[in-house]
Amino acid sequence: MSNRREFLKQAGIAAAAQSAIGASGANAIVVDPKPLFDISPHLYMQFMEPLGTTDSSVEAAWDYDRDDWRKDFVDTVKDLAPDVIRWGGIYSRYYKWREGIGPVARRPWHRNYAWGGKETNRVGTREFVDLCRRAGAEPLYCVNFLGDGEKWYRNTPEGDRTGDAREAADWVSYANDPDNRERKGHGVAEPSNIKLWQLGNETSYGNQTFTRDEAIAATIEFAKAMRERDPSIRLIGWGDRGRGANQLWAGELLKRAGERLDYVAIHLMGQSPKRPDTVLKGLRYQKEPERAWEELIELSNNVETRVSELESVIASQGARTSIAVTEGHLSLSPHNANPILCEWLSAVYHARSLNIYQRHGARVKIATGADFEGNRWTVNAVMLQTPRGVSYLMPVGSIARLFKKHNGRQGVGVKSAPAGLDIAASRTAGKVYLHVANLEYRKSVEAAFAVDGMAVTGGRVFEIAPEDPRQCVWQDQPDVFKPREATLASGPVLKWRFPAGSVTAVELDV
């Protein structure tokens, strides 16, 4: 009887709250608490790639005086708390993993063909995995997939830089086999147990890489060889379109190799502005920031279009394969270095993109909104002052940190919400979480909170709301986008006014 009385009591409170919302005339965010899917722990991945002379990235994060990762960098990464860190990118086409293992003094330098200069190999498998472990992240490696078919890497002045299926399989053994002699010979007794591996990076892009059929054949060969070494690994195949193709590679990839793959990858960094007179080039946005805001919302629409397209292709194959967005930074002109990404203006794109990934969380299981770290590219989540100094989060990093720290385990739906608010909702026992982006450049939006069949008894708000959308983060003001915390005022109706352009995480007690 006591359970029934409690149920009737809660139902009465919920009904009274709904009635009060109606009487007040307040616009409400109404949540349907029915669980729709489990939220992946890998929606806030970061992507690390040695970038040579283009952006010091990995080298900038290493402290050669201490012979360790920079302490300020590690502290910032722990605060960011990514669930996965990926190593790879175009760099994987000529990366030879064995050059980055064993005694440091014996590791050779190698040319960074895509990004200029040379890499020291000071950071290899052991050091990368160590960073992941310190941050509480799972490592993800993009293997050398026969150089993605780019023939030039077979005959470089330094020799053949491509890697075959056996080389990739040997890496799996080195990382995961408890009895691997090669690893033990380097003084590393325990395996790393790396479970996430990607086959192919942008394999469909350009005119020098594999054809679709060649890539699928290589995917089958690599998957078979790698899983023979460790059947428990999870593999990501390349499924984007390329070479003017109208269709994604994913359909044919899943038809022929789907049973060998856990994820299909696409990249969403190449969002080209749609307007012929766009202000999202160079410094044009500084004269018309509100128009830049509008264009960034338009670009975020394409993220949803691309994700929905891949969902449809996977469903058409009857596959259970998940989606992995393994690169998703906002690349604007000048290439990856537009200063708008230092400003809060860019928040509307980043917050909405991350919300899209979570709303599509039944299929999207790995995602990222940025490159990881560096000292020049503004697409980074973490910016490093060099040669030493502070590390700090860019707007995209601050939003990823906010959403990651205040999130539930199951995705739920939003039945209704005031115009101008973009929302992703989730829940865990006793709490409902809302990730809210106010897409209005000039207007605040007030909303009451309601959860169907449940009483909202209290809550907290964590909000980033600069007064000026042109607010910029920099090394002399690294904490300008630190969230402000507030408690929702008690009453028959819990409400909050979301400032113009704000990004907010709301925790509701139910």
Please give the residue ranges for each predicted region.
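Short Pro-Gly-centered flexible turn/kink motifs
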Residues: W496-L508
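Noncatalytic carbohydrate-binding groove/subsite architecture in carbohydrate-active enzymes
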Residues: R212-A347
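Aromatic/acidic polysaccharide-binding cleft in carbohydrate-active enzymes
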Residues: A324-I399, G411-S426
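Carbohydrate-binding surface patches
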Residues: G420-A455, V461, T504-A505
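N-terminal catalytic cores of secreted or lumenal carbohydrate-active enzymes
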Residues: N27-D262, I266-P276
